[in-house]
UniProtKB/Swiss-Prot annotation:
Keywords attached to this entry: Cell wall, Cell wall biogenesis/degradation, Repeat, Secreted, Signal
Superkingdom of origin organism: Eukaryota
Function: Responsible for plasticity of the cell wall.
Location in or out of the cell: Secreted, Cell wall
Main location: secreted
Name the record gives this protein: Glycine-rich cell wall structural protein
Residues annotated as signal peptide: 1-23
GO cellular component, one term: extracellular region
A single BP term in Gene Ontology: cell wall organization
Amino acid sequence: MGKVSFGFLGLMLVVVVIGVVECRRFEKETLGGGGGGGLGGGFGGGKGFGGGIGAGGGFGGGAGGGAGGGLGGGAGGGGGIGGGAGGGAGGGLGGGAGGGLGGGHGGGIGGGAGGGAGGGLGGGHGGGIGGGAGGGSGGGLGGGIGGGAGGGAGGGGGLGGGHGGGIGGGAGGGAGGGLGGGHGGGIGGGAGGGSGGGLGGGIGGGAGGGAGGGGGAGGGGGLGGGHGGGFGGGAGGGLGGGAGGGTGGGFGGGAGGGAGGGAGGGFGGGAGGGAGGGFGGGAGGGAGGGAGGGFGGGAGGGHGGGVGGGFGGGSGGGFGGGAGGGAGGGAGGGFGGGGGAGGGFGGGF
C-alpha cells in the first residue's frame, strides 16, 4: 500500500504523452487550419477551409481554402495573397493554379473571375494586373475582357500577350507575344485585331496576318503588324489607315478595295490599295484590287501604278500613270503614260 513503482509511473507518463499527441492531431484534423494555422486562420477552419502555411487559407483565408493559401484565400482553393473565389493551388497575388505573382486561374493582382492557368506577373487566362473576366491565355498587364469563347491555348507571352492582352488590350485580343502582340494586342489594341499586332493593333485585321504576311520582319507589317497593320492602324490601317486594309500595309495602308482588297497599301493609300503598294497604294482596284500601287496611286490602280496613277491604270504604270486604260488598261505606261499596250513617255489615253 502506498508504494508506486517507477515502472508504473513510466507507463503513465507514456500514456499522457500519447494522449497529448493524439489530441493535438485530432484538433488539427477537425478544427485547425489545414496545414498549420497561419495568421487569422480561415473562414470556419477545419480541413480544407482557410488556414495557414500549407493547405488552405493563410492570412484570413476564405472558405474552401486550397493548397498554397495566402492573404484572403478564397472559396474552393485560391491561395496567394488576396486569392479570389475559385482560386487554385500555389497562387501568388490573387491565387489560382500556376504560381508566380498572380499566376493561375483568375490570378494577377485583382485578377477577374474565370481567369486561367499561367504564371508570371498576372499570367494565365485572364490574369494580369486587374485582368478581366475570362481573359485569354497568357494575359499581361491589363489582360482582356474575354478573348472569345475558350480563349487561346498556349498563347500570350510578353507584356500584355494572349487574347485581348496588351496594356489595356481590347475585347477579343489574340494569341501573340511581344509588347501587346497577338490578335488585336498592342498597347490599347482594338477589338478583334489581326494576328500579329504591334503597337496599336487593328480593329479587325484580317485572318492570317503574322508570319509571312506583308512588310516588316515576320509578316504583317513592323509596328502594328498583322493584316493591314502599321503604326497604330485601324482595320487594316497603317498610320491612320482605313477599314479593310491590305496584307502588309506601309504607312497608311489601303481601305478595302472591293472583294478582297489589295495586299499592300502605302503611305496614305486609298480604298483598295495594291498588293505591293508603294507610297500611297491604289484607291479602288475592284474585286481583288491591283498588285502594285505607287506614290499616291489613283482609284483603280493597275499592277504597277505610278506616282499619282489615274483611274484604271495599266499593269506597269510609270511616273504619273494614265486616266483611262479601258477595260484592262495598258501594259506599260511611261512617265505620265495612259492606257494602251505600250504607252511611251507621256503616252495617250
